[in-house]
């Protein structure tokens, strides 16, 4: 329905726009429709020694982002919590079987509590609504966190979605042949069905390893036919117990095409030496990738680092120079550039061990190793595989291994423009990656000072190992546990100290304690309801503060990254913390320093933690607004109600966590934006000019680059934001005025004079 409305809007827009056009505009549109296919083109290449502003901003090291808006994610989160058992498959995929069983128990207990309250509405309603609100809030937050992994649930509907494999690039302008594609399809079809109850992550981990082995054992044969083969992955009918997916490929070749394909197979096996030269293959490769980069690199989306197999095989291509197959790129004749964007090439070359005198390239689908990287260690291993090559062993966790199968099961239809952008992103990382540049750094082994050439990833690996070895405090975990226990027992304690004096507490009986615990005469339904409410409050409150502790730990790690990064150019502190040390005495060193800065800023959880912090921030504002409204309604009777006391406890605990996060975030920004480092390096350059006048011109150049870097960092750096929301300025101002107006009313009522906080400039 929505697509039909958009089509109707586009049609009417073009219709009324036709009345405004003049001859010059119509001629320009005709030129644009023809496209650039008839324009003369020259060979070109991208210079990897230059940097983009994305490197300084940090978007070069992109992170995963959801493909649907947050409003839809919120709606889906609420639906998945309200109808929790109906989405059991989804919850098992994004959590685990044990956690799902635990959450299912809490869900049924909450349903029983609501039913008992409707039957006997004697207990305070806040004791029932509190856990319910927490359940809805955390379910929505979790749905937004995992939205980068699965964007559509794999329900049992009748609409079976399809997903096309990316077109692979092979020899002289030809497609991958049918035999090899069929072998890959048969390899993929051997994926076994898995029962849900049999260890979800373990099963997916094993199946994915099996699938990768089956595909990687197949070589690549090429043919000369320019016709395109479209391998398609179909989703079978999914059942709650068993999920199977199957790949089918339809291809038609003539007899002449089969002969040419057989000839190229002999070439790949080393039978014939009539291979194209390496220079020809590299020239074609540069033309292909340049064309793709021009077409696709138009957005700044956060995309995941995918298809490590394809990048690994390209690294092998630099080592195996005698037996490389020629690459190709097929672009169908079309009337616009938009049609050619649907052809995304998965470029890969590699060699197979054990073949003397020749090697065969491995061409795989670009989605072969798609992962979501829920933890920072998995992402680091993918970086090593991506930038160093297959010799780096990647220890991918079960979460990232399961992400590929989950994505295939979801049947998500991806935008071809996004696929092209992801290819260009990987191509840039491969050709101008930080791992290709090295700096002469100083390391300490005991009391000895030694030099070695290190890349950005090697330096960052040492920094991350120091951060991981840091002993984290448990103060905020203890605070969360204390607040959890206090909120769980609060209704009982409130009734106890309100109805009993200190003298009466000494002689209180067990029956009276049970009555105060239930808040009503202790009949069986009331006792069951009170026990359920206590258990729900205890578990859900602990889960909420557990998420807060995760956010606090992440902010602490970000601060440690920034702290160690600021010590790299200091010899004394670098030796103290056992990290590499180098000076910004060369332009190349400045480039590596900026790359390391951007890389460390993007390490670890980003958007997922921002979702948690944003939710806590909005919850704190909501509670503050409710408390202000209650105080304005009657400040003398404000503390008579138990839920107002609960609001105050929640507000105090959340403010403590938010103050901690705000202090860590601001300190992290200060460490990364510390201009004194660059100023100190400029002073060092002047000192070197005085000692070595013959290098004055070179040192002056470096000094000018340092000045430009200082200005650029000041231009791009933004102040720390506690909430991860991109808020409209109008909505922000309205929210600020409403909240501050309520607080101003409370303060004016308590102090006796008018004060208007919203007029104070923030």
From Swiss-Prot:
Pfam families: PHTF1-2_N
Domain PHTF per the UniProt entry, residue ranges: 6-150
Renumbered residue ranges of the record's region Disordered: 152-184, 344-380, 393-415
Membrane topology category: Multi-pass membrane protein
Ranges of Basic and acidic residues composition bias in the record: 365-376
Modified residues (Phosphoserine): 272, 276-277, 334, 336
Signal peptide: none
CC per GO annotation: endoplasmic reticulum membrane; Golgi apparatus
Tissue: Widely expressed with highest levels in testis.
Transmembrane segment boundaries: 77-97, 99-119, 121-141, 473-493, 512-532, 611-631, 645-665, 737-757
Subcellular location: Endoplasmic reticulum membrane; Golgi apparatus, cis-Golgi network membrane
Keyword Endoplasmic reticulum: yes
Keywords linked to the UniProt accession: Endoplasmic reticulum, Glycoprotein, Golgi apparatus, Membrane, Phosphoprotein, Transmembrane, Transmembrane helix
Low complexity composition-biased segments: 348-361
InterPro entries: PHTF1/2 (IPR039775), PHTF1/2_N (IPR021980)
Residues listed as glycosylation sites in the UniProt record: 179-180, 363, 431, 674, 733
Location, primary (coarse class): endoplasmic reticulum
PANTHER family recorded: PROTEIN PHTF1 (PTHR12680:SF8), PUTATIVE HOMEODOMAIN TRANSCRIPTION FACTOR PHTF (PTHR12680)
Assembly behavior: Interacts with FEM1B.
Protein's recorded name: Protein PHTF1
Gene: PHTF1
């Amino acid at each position: 329905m929505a697509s039909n409305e958009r089509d109707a809007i586009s049609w009417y827009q073009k219709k009324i726009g036709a009345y405004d056009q003049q001859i010059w505009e119509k001629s320009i549109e005709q030129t644009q429709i023809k496209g650039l296919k008839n324009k003369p083109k020259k060979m070109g290449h991208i210079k990897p020694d230059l940097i983009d502003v994305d490197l300084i901003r940090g978007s070069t090291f992109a992170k995963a982002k959801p493909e649907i808006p947050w409003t839809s994610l919120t709606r889906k989160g609420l639906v998945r919590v309200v109808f929790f058992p109906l989405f059991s498959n989804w919850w098992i995929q994004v959590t685990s079987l044990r956690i799902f069983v635990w959450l299912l128990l809490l869900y049924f207990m909450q349903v029983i509590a609501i039913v008992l309250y409707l039957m006997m509405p004697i207990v305070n309603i806040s004791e029932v609504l509190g856990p319910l609100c927490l359940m809805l809030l955390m379910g929505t937050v979790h749905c937004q966190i995992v939205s980068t992994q699965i964007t559509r649930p794999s329900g049992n509907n009748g609409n079976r979605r399809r997903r096309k494999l990316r077109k692979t690039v092979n020899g002289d302008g030809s497609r991958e042949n049918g035999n090899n594609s069929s072998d890959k399809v048969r390899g993929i079809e051997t994926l076994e069905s898995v029962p849900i109850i049999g260890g979800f992550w373990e099963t997916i981990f094993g199946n994915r390893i099996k699938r990768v082995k089956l595909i990687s054992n197949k070589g690549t044969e090429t043919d000369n036919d320019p016709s395109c083969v479209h391998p398609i992955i179909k989703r079978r009918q999914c059942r709650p117990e068993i999920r199977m997916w199957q790949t089918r490929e339809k291809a038609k070749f003539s007899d002449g095409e089969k002969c040419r394909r057989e000839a190229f197979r002999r070439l790949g096996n080393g039978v014939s030496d009539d291979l194209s030269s390496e220079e020809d293959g590299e020239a074609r490769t540069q033309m292909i990738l340049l064309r793709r980069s021009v077409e696709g690199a138009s957005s700044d989306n956060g995309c995941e680092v995918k298809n490590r197999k394809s990048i690994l095989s390209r690294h092998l291509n630099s080592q195996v120079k005698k037996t490389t197959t020629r690459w190709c790129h097929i672009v169908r004749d079309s009337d616009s550039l938009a049609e050619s964007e649907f052809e995304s090439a998965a470029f890969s070359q590699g060699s197979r061990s054990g073949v003397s005198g020749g090697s065969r390239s491995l061409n795989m689908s670009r989605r072969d190793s798609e992962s979501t990287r829920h933890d920072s260690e998995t992402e680091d291993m993918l970086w090593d595989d991506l930038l160093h090559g297959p010799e780096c062993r990647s220890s991918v966790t079960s979460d990232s291994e399961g992400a590929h199968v989950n994505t295939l099961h979801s049947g998500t239809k991806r935008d071809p423009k996004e696929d092209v952008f992801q290819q260009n992103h990987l191509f840039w990382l491969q050709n101008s990656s930080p791992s290709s540049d090295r700096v002469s750094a100083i390391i300490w082994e005991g009391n000895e000072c030694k030099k070695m050439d290190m890349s950005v990833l090697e330096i960052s690996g040492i920094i991350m190992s120091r951060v991981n070895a840091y002993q984290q405090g448990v103060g905020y975990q203890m605070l969360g546990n204390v607040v959890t226990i206090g909120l769980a027992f609060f209704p009982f304690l409130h009734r106890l100290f309100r109805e009993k004096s200190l003298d009466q507490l000494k002689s209180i009986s067990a029956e009276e304690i049970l009555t105060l615990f239930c808040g009503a005469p202790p009949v069986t339904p009331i006792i069951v309801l009170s026990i359920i409410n206590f258990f729900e409050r205890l578990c859900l409150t602990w889960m909420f503060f557990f998420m807060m502790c995760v956010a606090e730990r992440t902010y602490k790690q970000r601060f440690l990254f920034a702290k160690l990064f600021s010590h790299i150019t200091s010899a004394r502190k670098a030796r103290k913390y056992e990290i590499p040390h180098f000076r910004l005495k060369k332009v190349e060193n400045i480039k590596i320093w900026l790359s390391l800065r951007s890389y460390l800023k993007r390490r670890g959880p980003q958007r997922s933690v921002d979702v948690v912090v944003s939710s806590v921030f909005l919850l704190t504002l909501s509670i503050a607004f409710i408390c202000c409204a209650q105080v304005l309604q009657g400040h003398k009777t404000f503390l008579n109600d138990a839920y107002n006391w609960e609001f105050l406890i929640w507000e105090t605990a959340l403010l403590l966590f938010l103050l901690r996060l705000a202090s860590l975030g601001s300190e992290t920004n200060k460490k990364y934006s510390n201009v004194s480092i660059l100023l100190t390096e400029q002073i060092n350059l002047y000192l070197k000019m005085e000692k070595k006048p013959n290098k004055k011109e070179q040192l002056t150049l470096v000094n000018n680059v340092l000045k430009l870097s200082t200005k650029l960092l000041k231009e791009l750096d933004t102040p720390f934001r506690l909430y991860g929301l991109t808020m409209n300025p109008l909505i922000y101002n309205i929210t600020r005025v409403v909240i501050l107006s309520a607080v101003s009313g409370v303060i004016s009522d308590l102090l006796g004079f008018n004060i208007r906080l919203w007029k104070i400039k923030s």
